[in-house]
Every structure is written in C-alpha cells, then in structure tokens.
Amino acid sequence: KDIPGYANLINLDYLKPLNEVLTRDTGDFNGTIEQLTTDDGNFYAVPFRSDFWVLYYNKDLFDKAGVEYPSNDLTMEDYDALARKMTSGSGDTKVYGCHYHTWRSAASLFSILDGKNTIIDGKYDFMKPTYDMVIAQQKDGICMDYGYLKTSSLHYSAAFENQQCAMVNMGSWFISTLEAYMKDAETKFNWGIVKYPH
C-alpha cells in the first residue's frame, strides 16, 4: 500500500508493467501516471482514488485541556510540542498526544512533504529527524509504542474513536469512517482536521 512496498514487489518481479495494458490516453490522470513511472520507464499501478493526509484532532480533548486547536501551519516542532502538551493521565485513562498507525507512511510521510526528498532512490538519511522525534515520543509516552500496536492490532480508528489520542495523522478516507462512527456512537465527540505538519 505504499511506495517501498510496491518497489519491493517490483524488484521481486511480482508486479508486471502496465504500459501495454493501459493503451488509452492517460491525460485524465492529471500527471499521476508520470509520478508512478519508475526509473525504467514503466508504471505498475494506476490511481484509483485521490486521497491526501491530514491531521485529525479531538476538539473536546483540546477544550478540556485548555489548549488551542492545531493550526494549518504547524511545523514539526510545533506538532511535537502540542502532542507533548496534550498527553495526560495514565493506565486505562491515559490520553496520548498523538498516534501513529503501524504503516511505514504514518511516520515517513512527514519527511517527504517538502518535495525535496524521495524514498525511491534508496537514500533515507533525511528521515532521521522524523524517526528520532517519533522514537522520542514513544520513549516519553507521548504516543503508543509500535510494538504494542502491532501485537494488540489496535487500529488507528479505534484509538481515535475511543478518545485514546488527541491527534492522529491519517488520510482523507478516514473522514467518512468518522462520520459513520459518530452517527451511532454512544460517546460522541467533536473533531476537526488541519493541514499536515511541515
């Protein structure tokens, strides 16, 4: 479901190029085919929807903490500070300031938003500051531990819907999930979205 995963499948020869299969004009993909084209001139996937990542936040938790909502211009430093400020409690009542799902992209995406870096070329040192931040947040109890998330199979939607975290970075597809959840939820809460931190 992400570029490194696709790249690995291509390298293992599990995916075949679609260049000869998709012979119609691809102009209506608005440049996405070009973005999906690999160094060898082939493309192995076609876009099926257009999603983007945003930062979801629980307005009620922010109100309760007396903390201003996230802005549309959060730097990574602002985001980290806000997550730390929003972390409270312990045990079953702990609220984590932020949450990262177990997908690679939940952490690595922060590193490529500036458009200056790519994960295609195999050089990943530019991701170190992001991973250092996430690992520090785990050690400090600001976000749930990756190992715990993997072994418990806790889904990002459950963490956010159960109000276990104040913020979660996730794709726009989560909007419809949240709306559906809120229709029948016993405990409803107010939530919002802002642009991804940079």
Where are these regions (language model features)?
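A ligand-binding cleft/hinge motif common to bilobed small-molecule-binding domains
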Residues: 6-10, 172-187
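Short glycine- and hydrophobic/aromatic-rich loop-to-beta-strand nucleating segment
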Residues: 53-57
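Glycine-centered hinge/linker elements that transmit conformational signals in sensory
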Residues: 83-84, 119-150, 196
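Extracytoplasmic/periplasmic substrate-recognition and gating elements
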Residues: 42, 65, 140, 183-198
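Alpha-to-beta junction loops
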Residues: 1, 162-170
